[in-house]
């Protein structure tokens, strides 16, 4: 949790906001009751950080949470559990777009690891790390992301994994 007034300090100090989106849809079950509704306005405040120019870095926090990055992508897009609750999402003003979410999982994570000059985006001269999936993430509804299958993983330009048919 962060107070809205403290977000500018992240920008001024060049800090990274590193979070796991899946935590938001787990913590929403108890956060209001335990922490108070006014305090949780700044829980997983991705939009506040992004709008202030703070670097976001996302991960899965496996094995504590589900290892699939698509679960985290779904959480960042919807702020809802797998059943679609609550309607509209928990603190929906903090939801992100798919572009923003994927960037936080890739370029943002590389930046947080001080490795953004080597990986995190597809660009000549950087490592070619690619995940090929079974659907166009930009053309499916968020709940469909939960069933995404990895077909191939390429690390530094070489095939590291291929799904069996």
Label each PLM-derived region with a short phrase.
Residues 4-138, 143, 148, 152-156:
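His/Asp/Glu-enriched, well-ordered alpha-helical/loop segment
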